[in-house]
Amino acid sequence: MTLLALGINHKTAPVSLRERVSFSPDKLDQALDSLLAQPMVQGGVVLSTCNRTELYLSVEEQDNLQEALIRWLCDYHNLNEEDLRKSLYWHQDNDAVSHLMRVASGLDSLVLGEPQILGQVKKAFADSQKGHMKASELERMFQKSFSVAKRVRTETDIGASAVSVAFAACTLARQIFESLSTVTVLLVGAGETIELVARHLREHKVQKMIIANRTRERAQILADEVGAEVIALSEIDERLREADIIISSTASPLPIIGKGMVERALKSRRNQPMLLVDIAVPRDVEPEVGKLANAYLYSVDDLQSIISHNLAQRKAAAVEAETIVAQETSEFMAWLRAQSASETIREYRSQAEHVRDELTAKALAALEQGGDAQAIMQDLAWKLTNRLIHAPTKSLQQAARDGDNERLNILRDSLGLE
């Protein structure tokens, strides 16, 4: 039995190839059935995200194994083998285990240490459980990777610092406000960055969100997802006073929120502080707003400096995480080798018990026919001894004929000889 990990990711393949190799959720069961129909495959998990498609397999060793699996992948997706080979990586046993642990821990992600990948790996594993997981070693490898990812999160700072603009904006808000559950957040725009911000805020229990956008339809889709209210851009002046936090990211060529607008809002709020995070380029908030008392304005450049600092911290934490992965990989491979020995021990014991039962049955039959008990017992002991030492004796003789002293010593040790 061999463990394999093969696939492509954002580092080895462009999006034009990644999208062709991906497995859609509605076709995943069919793909797993097709994969497990391959004679060498004992168990399989398919991990398919926007940044990677990987197959994790338990297989029987055979000639041309790599070629057979690449051919299956190309046939399934109607791909040119040469195109795929240029971008494909292939990891076996120790390297496959280490790779999965690194993936689950976010060490192989586009955004170093991002937590979402662990959920994606868990879902891929759960999907494989629906009648497709047939190899206990593969199942154990995934369960181990989940505990390793948890350990990396617990024992290092790999996920402690924001390294995306959206996440950094939310982290800044959490640092300034003791609890986000009691604040009102105004989001200006409804593009990808604001979508990410809104989801982060929802995860941190923000109860009231207002989304202001040029087109109501796009904003409404996001609002329905996160439980927000939608307003027009023209309503910002009137509603700004309600917001404790304003996060803005539009494509407007001119500022949307001016100094006068914020002054009026602060007056209505009786100078309760406002946090304004402007992550738009060009800027959505007039820079002069930052000069107002109780208005705390941060630009995308401010966030980038936070991100750069945090990325350096994550890289330092990644060194610690790699040490954990190496240690856990070594422990898993030791367990795997022990499993192999356990199977050999079971076979050896079963063989010995079969010999014992066979000879005991013959001895009992002889006793029932009135044979001499002492002679029957001596015959049983002699035959049992000969049958049990026959195979080890042949191995010792062959090692001696070959002049293989190392094998002789191993056999002596195995047989408990001084």
From Swiss-Prot:
Entry keyword Transport: no
Domain of life the protein comes from? Bacteria
- The UniProt site entry described as Important for activity is assigned to 99
Residue positions binding substrate = 49-52, 109, 114-116, 120
Residues forming the catalytic site: 50
User: E.C. number, please?
Assistant: 1.2.1.70
**Which pathway does the UniProt entry assign to this protein?**
Porphyrin-containing compound metabolism; protoporphyrin-IX biosynthesis; 5-aminolevulinate from L-glutamyl-tRNA(Glu): step 1/2
Tell me any Pfam family this protein matches.
Shikimate_DH
- Catalytic activity, reaction form: (S)-4-amino-5-oxopentanoate + tRNA(Glu) + NADP(+) = L-glutamyl-tRNA(Glu) + NADPH + H(+)
Instruction: Give the GO terms filed under biological process for this record.
Output: protoporphyrinogen IX biosynthetic process from glutamate
Enumerate the residues binding NADP(+): 189-194
The alphabetical list of record keywords is: NADP, Oxidoreductase, Porphyrin biosynthesis
Q: Which GO terms describe its molecular function?
A: glutamyl-tRNA reductase activity; NADP binding
Q: Which HAMAP family match?
A: Glu_tRNA_reductase (MF_00087)
What the entry lists under NCBIfam families is as follows:
hemA
In terms of PANTHER family, this protein maps to: GLUTAMYL-TRNA REDUCTASE
Q: What does this protein do?
A: Catalyzes the NADPH-dependent reduction of glutamyl-tRNA(Glu) to glutamate 1-semialdehyde (GSA).
Identify its protein family: Belongs to the glutamyl-tRNA reductase family.
> Please, what other remarks does the record include?
During catalysis, the active site Cys acts as a nucleophile attacking the alpha-carbonyl group of tRNA-bound glutamate with the formation of a thioester intermediate between enzyme and glutamate, and the concomitant release of tRNA(Glu). The thioester intermediate is finally reduced by direct hydride transfer from NADPH, to form the product GSA.
- Complexes and interactors: Homodimer.
The Swiss-Prot or TrEMBL note on domains reads:
Possesses an unusual extended V-shaped dimeric structure with each monomer consisting of three distinct domains arranged along a curved 'spinal' alpha-helix. The N-terminal catalytic domain specifically recognizes the glutamate moiety of the substrate. The second domain is the NADPH-binding domain, and the third C-terminal domain is responsible for dimerization.
What name does this protein carry? Answer: Glutamyl-tRNA reductase
Q: Which organism is it from?
A: Escherichia coli O139:H28 (strain E24377A / ETEC)
Its encoding gene is what? hemA
